[in-house]
Each structure stands twice: as structure tokens, then as C-alpha cells.
Amino acid sequence: MTIKLAVTGKSGSGKTTITKAFLRIFQELFPEKSILLFDNDLASELGHSFGLDIRNTIYGIRNGKHEYKTGIPENMTKQEYIEWAMEDILVPVCDNVDIIVSWFVGSKDCRCPITNQINDAVLKLLDRYDIVIFDCEFDLKYLNQLVDTDIDTTIIVAN
């Protein structure tokens, strides 16, 4: 079972710092667990805080602007392609820790098939990790627009 933690608050409130603190705590307490950092903040600062320059996002997959690290395998369905592209944009941070960036994802009100396909691919990705930490915008609607999933704990950072 995946544990999901969302850290939210207004810009500049320390969300990224707190997200990284929780990462360290989880790494110390559960070194064998796999952890996914999910940067769902429009500023996308979480990757930068590790010295990473992450340019590929879920938004890029949605809009066809994803820059591939590898060649696209042939004969895939659209769903298989989206799942493959999600794997392609995962960036390793350290042992057992990966990061993925969503950036802007659109609205759940959109009836386009890509919305459901991305939701399904994200759910499948989340299930592969023991712990997922979401670094979110001030409004959790951005997380809800990306994926329909239950969050175990939400931390609201205020200054």
C-alpha cells in the first residue's frame, strides 16, 4: 500500500523545504522504501532544490512537447505510450528516490480522453512506490485536476 502525503501552502511559505525534510525523515526511518517526489507546484522548484534541471513534465506529455530520452517503441496504444512517457520523464534523485514534475495539467472538467489516460497512468505510477510526497500549489485543486487518488495526510504550510 502506498502512503501519500501532500504538502500545500502559498508560494514562498516553505513547502519545498518541508517536503525535503519529510523525504529525509522517511529515508532515515525506512531506508528500504521506494519514494516518489511529485512536484505539482507551478513553480517546479523541488527538482531545482536538488540541483536538477527538469524540463520534461506531465504537461509536456499532454501537449506533445515531451523531449524523449530514448526512442519511442513501436506499436503502442495511446495508453501504453502515456505510461511509457511517464517512465521517460522520471528523474532519479538518489537511491530509491525519484522525482516527476507535472506543471500545469488542465481541468478534470475536460472530457478529452487524454485527461483520463493521464490519470490512469499516474495512478499506475503511484502504486509502484511505497511513499509518495506531493509538493503542491496553494490550492489542492491542482492535484485533484491531475489525479483522482486519496491522500493519507495533507500538511498546510502557513507563514
Predicted regions: what they are:
Residues 4:
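Walker A (P-loop) ATP-phosphate-binding motif of ABC ATPase nucleotide-binding domains
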Residues 7:
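Hydrophobic anchor at the beta1->P-loop junction of P-loop NTPases
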Residues 11:
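The conserved Walker
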Residues 15:
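Conserved lysine of the Walker
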Residues 18, 22:
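Hydrophobic positions on the alpha1 helix immediately C-terminal to the Walker A/P-loop
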Residues 25-94:
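N-terminal phosphate/diphosphate-binding loop that engages ATP/GTP or pyrophosphate donors
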Residues 82-89, 99-138:
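Cytosolic-facing regulatory segments adjacent to core modules
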Residues 124-128, 143-159:
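Inter-motif core of Ras-like GTPase G domains
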